[in-house]
C-alpha cells in the first residue's frame, strides 16, 4: 500500500424517540438512520506506527481522536504491531448530529482490518465499534436506511432508501450530545410508534400522514436554547420542504423535498445565508467500501 483514500459518509436521523434511561446512565432510543452525501475523506499510508494528521486544526490528532482510538483498539484486539499514517480531510461538521466522527472511526476499523490482513471477525468489530460510540456500528455495518434501538447499537437493515431529495444544513452551532441528553424534555411515558412500519408506508406507499410520528425528542430543548436552529427548520419548510427536522442532537437540520428544483432553491438560499449545506439525491446509499475509494 502506497496510499489509499476512502470516503466516510454522514447520516441523519428520521425520527429520534428517547424511550428510557438504563441503570448505567445511558439513554435508550429508537430511530431511523439514513445516509447522506456529505463525507470526510481519510487517507491511509504505510507506517511503522499509528499516526494522524487532520485538515481541521481544531480537532485533536492524539488518543482523543476517534480515528486514533479505533486504530489502537483494532491493533490491541488482534495483537497486531502494524501501523498506519492517516490523514483526515474533515468536511462533515462536528457537533452537528451527523455522526461524522463515528463514521470516521468505522472507516478506520473496516479499512485497517483489511489492510493489515488481521481478519478480525464481524462480531469482534461490532464490539469494538460499540465501545467507540453508539453510532459507530451503523456506519460499520449498514449502507442504507436502518432501524436502531438500544443506545443506537441494535440495528436492523430495512432494505430501503429515501425516495426524496434531502437538503441538510449546518447552522454553524456546535451542540454537545452530553448537553442534549441533560436538557431534553423527558416524556418516557408516551406510546412509541413502530418507526419501521411507518417508514415502509412513507417510502413504499407515499403515505405522508405518518410523518407526524417522526419526532426528534431533542428538538424542543435545542430550539429553545439555539433559536438559530429553529429558524433554519422554518426556512426549509418555507422553501418547499414537506418535512424538516433536527438530526440527532443537532445542530444540523434537514428537509425532504419532492423536486430537485425546490431542493436546489433551498440549497442556494441557505448558502446565501452563510450556512454549509449538502444535497442528497433520492435513492442514496453509502457505497460499498471499494466504491468509496478515491
Curated annotation (Swiss-Prot):
Keywords: ATP-binding, Isoprene biosynthesis, Kinase, Nucleotide-binding, Transferase. Its EC number is 2.7.1.148. GO terms for molecular function: 4-(cytidine 5'-diphospho)-2-C-methyl-D-erythritol kinase activity; ATP binding. Gene3D superfamilies: 3.30.230.10, GHMP kinase, C-terminal domain. Pfam families: GHMP_kinases_C, GHMP_kinases_N. The keyword Kinase applies. ATP binds at residues 93-103. The active site is at 11, 135. Pathway: Isoprenoid biosynthesis; isopentenyl diphosphate biosynthesis via DXP pathway; isopentenyl diphosphate from 1-deoxy-D-xylulose 5-phosphate: step 3/6. GO terms for biological process: isopentenyl diphosphate biosynthetic process, methylerythritol 4-phosphate pathway; terpenoid biosynthetic process. It catalyses: 4-CDP-2-C-methyl-D-erythritol + ATP = 4-CDP-2-C-methyl-D-erythritol 2-phosphate + ADP + H(+). The keyword Glycoprotein does not apply. PANTHER family: 4-DIPHOSPHOCYTIDYL-2-C-METHYL-D-ERYTHRITOL KINASE, CHLOROPLASTIC (PTHR43527:SF2). Belongs to the GHMP kinase family. IspE subfamily. Catalyzes the phosphorylation of the position 2 hydroxy group of 4-diphosphocytidyl-2C-methyl-D-erythritol. This is 4-diphosphocytidyl-2-C-methyl-D-erythritol kinase.
